[in-house]
């Protein structure tokens, strides 16, 4: 049985690649059980649906930090639907020049947190500069009311990453309907394809 440890999405040449780390209970020739830690890295970009979902979540993650601009903070009275689902954040110049190069999802058999790494392009004396940043570890706490829309979307995407990664590690290529069926099986409840 595979136990999820960490999923890392790295951006190279505007494409996202996945690296997954798992632990598993293995059996040696003498039939003794032991814990084995191992990882697998893809050499193919992640699929389009997952890539699009990840791109849409970046502003939500950045909005949950104070690194891009000190005025970016979670606000309980915020209209999340309007700001994120209607892509109003595209007009927010505080996100201009923000590039996330890596997202690391951590946990203990479940996705519990995420941390972002990247840079913001700024111009000084007529020349562009990359100012590197990394966010704090962002806990995926479904019960924090002011973070609920953010967390629900993150968890949904992380579940997709886990399902796709497990099957990819087994050498399978899945359709969207097959991914939905696997998610339904793991969650024990129907999931729309």
Tell what function each PLM region has.
Residues 1-111:
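OB-fold ssDNA-binding interfaces and closely related basic DNA-contact patches used
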Residues 52, 175, 192-193:
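Secondary-structure junction/capping motif
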Residues 94-186:
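Conserved binding-pocket/active-site segment within a compact domain
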Residues 185-193:
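Polybasic, proline/glycine-rich intrinsically disordered low-complexity segments
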């Amino acid at each position: 049985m595979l136990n999820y440890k960490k999923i890392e999405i790295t951006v190279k040449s505007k494409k996202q690649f996945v690296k997954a780390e798992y632990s598993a209970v293995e059996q040696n020739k003498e039939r003794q059980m032991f814990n084995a830690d191992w990882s697998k890295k893809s050499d193919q970009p992640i699929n389009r649906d997952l890539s699009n979902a990840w791109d849409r979540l970046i502003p939500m993650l950045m909005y949950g930090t104070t690194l891009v601009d000190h005025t970016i903070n979670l606000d309980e009275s915020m209209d999340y639907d309007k700001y994120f689902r209607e892509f109003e954040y595209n007009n927010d110049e505080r996100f201009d020049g923000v590039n996330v190069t890596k997202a690391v999802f951590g946990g203990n058999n479940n996705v519990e947190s995420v941390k972002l790494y990247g840079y913001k392009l700024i111009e000084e004396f007529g020349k562009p500069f990359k100012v590197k940043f990394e966010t704090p570890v962002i806990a995926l706490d479904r019960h924090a009311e002011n973070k609920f829309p953010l967390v629900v979307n993150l968890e949904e995407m992380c579940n997709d990453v886990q399902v796709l990664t497990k099957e990819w590690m087994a050498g399978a290529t899945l359709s969207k309907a097959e991914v939905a069926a696997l998610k339904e099986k793991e969650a024990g409840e129907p999931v729309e394809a």
